[in-house]
């Protein structure tokens, strides 16, 4: 089992980062809330990983800290929530925001996430709330807002296309993803900024 990777970022294609360690390039799927905090390509990064084996694929999911990974593992134990949906949930809101939404039973915030209907949101609140009681020490200390670094490289159409592709990968329908990006698009924004702003606007 691969639990942690330390290496050089070769490529960032939201929501996937290609990380080289020991001469091997690992494709790691990351929630966008974690992806925003990665350094630029060519720099070193450390990610905590969860390895998922399926019949048709072997996938690595990466996180900036163990707490985010713990939450991801708990999410995929929930009936009807697989790794892809868990990734979408933690892209739409930070791990701390999700914990807060569950503990405050904010159904409205959860159903705005892609792939989450009312029944799934209710199930998440019921199942995750119980698990948080035993996990609190392992999860989060008092809430701290994430400081998101502004990504470099300004682009325009390419950035918009990348942002749409990333939102589709997170579970949004292509037309919906295009609409979300066009609403907040601006010429100097990078794809990461567009994704972040589109997800914020959706909530």
Curated annotation (Swiss-Prot):
Q: Where are the stretches annotated Domain II? A: 65-142
**A cellular-component GO term for this protein:** Holliday junction resolvase complex
Could you tell me which residues belong to the region Flexible linker?
Answer: 143-154
Residue ranges of the region described as Domain III: 156-203
As for family, the record states: Belongs to the RuvA family.
NCBIfam families per the UniProt record, alphabetical:
ruvA
Q: What does this protein do?
A: The RuvA-RuvB-RuvC complex processes Holliday junction (HJ) DNA during genetic recombination and DNA repair, while the RuvA-RuvB complex plays an important role in the rescue of blocked DNA replication forks via replication fork reversal (RFR). RuvA specifically binds to HJ cruciform DNA, conferring on it an open structure. The RuvB hexamer acts as an ATP-dependent pump, pulling dsDNA into and through the RuvAB complex. HJ branch migration allows RuvC to scan DNA until it finds its consensus sequence, where it cleaves and resolves the cruciform DNA. In complex with Holliday junction (HJ) DNA, endogenous RuvB or RuvB from S.thermophilus and ATP catalyzes branch migration. Binding of domain III of RuvA to a single subunit of the RuvB hexamer activates the RuvB ATPase 2 subunits away and nucleotide exchange in the adjacent RuvB subunit.
Q: What is this protein called?
A: Holliday junction branch migration complex subunit RuvA
- The protein's organism comes out as Salmonella typhimurium (strain LT2 / SGSC1412 / ATCC 700720)
């Amino acid at each position: 089992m691969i639990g942690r990777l330390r290496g050089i970022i070769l490529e960032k294609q939201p929501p996937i980062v290609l990380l080289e360690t020991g001469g091997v390039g690992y494709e790691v799927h990351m929630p966008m809330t974690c992806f925003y905090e990665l350094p630029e390509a060519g720099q070193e990064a450390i990610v905590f990983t969860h390895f998922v084996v399926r019949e048709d694929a072997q996938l690595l999911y990466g996180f900036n800290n163990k707490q985010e990974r713990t939450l991801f593992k708990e999410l995929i134990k929930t009936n009807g929530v697989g790794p892809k949906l868990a990734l979408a949930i933690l892209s739409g809101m930070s791990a701390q925001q999700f914990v807060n939404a569950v503990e405050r039973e904010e159904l409205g915030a959860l159903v705005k996430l892609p792939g989450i209907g009312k029944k799934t949101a209710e199930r998440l609140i019921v199942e995750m709330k119980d698990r948080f009681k035993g996990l609190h020490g392992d999860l989060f200390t008092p809430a701290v807002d994430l400081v998101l670094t502004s990504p470099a490289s300004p682009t325009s159409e390419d950035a918009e296309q990348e942002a749409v592709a990333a939102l589709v990968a997170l579970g949004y329908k292509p037309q919906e993803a295009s609409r979300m990006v066009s609403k907040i698009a601006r010429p100097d924004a990078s794809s990461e900024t567009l994704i972040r702003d589109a997800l914020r606007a959706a909530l």
